[in-house]
């Protein structure tokens, strides 16, 4: 089992998206990249801790590789807006790849360069690519949020359309 740590706006969106993929065994919402030892949601949302909302993905590289995870990552959020995803604004919503080794770093740089060269987006990608500091799991009520709260407005208006996009574009990667 390998791990990936990605931030692309609200972690509820990424958790719901990656949980649907074949080869993904576990997705944990959490915080990464800040300067406090034990961040909580309030500190992260205030911007005071410097952390980014992220997901830690545990995956089987024999079933899905890191580059494919990144393709899905770039499809489900806007990597061209600095510290913002839709109405979610602040450094905690940064687009970020926290790599765990040099292979992940090189893969991330290669995928970004390819997407920029192909002009997939209307603006350059501003995703941070940084060595992963300590990952901090978020509070329990953030885990599996979409699965437990599908009728909430945020889930219906923000997360569900992203999941529909994944079903259309990456149907071959979905769990049965």
UniProtKB/Swiss-Prot annotation:
Oxidoreductase in keyword set: yes
Pfam families cross-referenced by the UniProt entry: PMSR
Catalytic reaction(s) noted: L-methionyl-[protein] + [thioredoxin]-disulfide + H2O = L-methionyl-(S)-S-oxide-[protein] + [thioredoxin]-dithiol; [thioredoxin]-disulfide + L-methionine + H2O = L-methionine (S)-S-oxide + [thioredoxin]-dithiol
GO biological process: protein modification process
EC nos: 1.8.4.11
Record keywords: Oxidoreductase
Highest taxon listed in the record's lineage: Bacteria
Active-site residues annotated for this sequence: 10
Molecular function as annotated in GO: L-methionine:thioredoxin-disulfide S-oxidoreductase activity; peptide-methionine (S)-S-oxide reductase activity
NCBIfam families the UniProt entry points to: msrA (TIGR00401)
Job of this protein: Has an important function as a repair enzyme for proteins that have been inactivated by oxidation. Catalyzes the reversible oxidation-reduction of methionine sulfoxide in proteins to methionine.
Name listed for the protein in its UniProt record: Peptide methionine sulfoxide reductase MsrA
Designated gene of the protein: msrA
């Amino acid at each position: 089992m390998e791990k990936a740590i990605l931030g692309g706006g609200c972690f509820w969106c990424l958790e719901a998206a990656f949980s649907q993929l074949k080869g993904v065994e576990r997705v944990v919402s959490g915080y990464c990249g800040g300067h406090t030892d034990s961040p909580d949601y309030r500190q992260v949302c205030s911007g005071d801790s410097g952390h980014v909302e992220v997901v830690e993905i545990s995956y089987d590289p024999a079933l899905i590789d890191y580059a494919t995870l990144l393709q899905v990552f770039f499809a489900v959020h806007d990597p061209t807006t600095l510290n913002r995803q839709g109405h979610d604004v602040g450094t905690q919503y940064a687009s970020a790849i926290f790599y765990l080794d040099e292979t992940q770093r090189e893969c991330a740089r290669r995928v970004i360069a390819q997407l920029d060269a192909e002009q997939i987006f209307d603006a350059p990608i501003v995703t941070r690519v940084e060595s992963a500091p300590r990952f901090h799991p978020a509070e329990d009520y953030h885990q599996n949020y979409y699965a437990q709260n599908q009728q909430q407005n945020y889930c219906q208006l923000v997360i569900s359309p992203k999941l529909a996009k994944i079903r259309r574009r990456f149907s071959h990667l979905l769990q049965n």
